[in-house]
């Protein structure tokens, strides 16, 4: 097992590994970048991201693009990106048995693993490329601008309607005063 990355939990993980007596089977690679990350994805059988909080998950997209099957927690952004047994495997957040089951299924079901890997790579290529991202960003700005303009026009119409209503009430009051005269 290779654990990549750094963070506040690394010392606790190392202590757990040592306490379990599996230190010789677990390698802590630390932070990796660039070509090292690509080599790691190519060497790995599966990439597992058991996050308890993940707003988006760039590393999972990198693994998918590298044709590395992924196992993710069913939370955050990855929950929206990954469809279970379509382009990855979802597990119950914080449930080690769920993670183990997903890993074993990928290791033993080569057909499923190949299908997931292919679909995952296609999803990343089609939905997370710079052209698509720029189009989506442009659309979001257009939508926000149009919404803002529509809200401004609505406010202006409401103000105009209020002025006309006030003027009509004043005119009605003047007519009533003239008739009372």
Where are these regions (language model features)?
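C-terminal alpha-helical cap of glycosyltransferases
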Residues: 130-181
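A short, well-ordered alpha-helix in the C-terminal region of glycosyltransferases
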Residues: 98, 105, 112-126, 133-139
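Short hydrophobic beta-strand element within catalytic cores of glycosyltransferases
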Residues: 69-72, 82
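Aromatic "clamp/platform" in nucleotide-sugar-dependent glycosyltransferases that forms part
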Residues: 52
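Nucleotide-activated donor-binding/catalytic signature segment of Leloir-type glycosyltransferases, i.e.
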Residues: 12-32
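Conserved acidic donor-binding segment of nucleotide-sugar-dependent glycosyltransferases
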Residues: 84-85, 89-96, 105-110
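Short alpha-helical donor nucleotide-sugar binding micro-motif in glycosyltransferases
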Residues: 31-32, 39-44
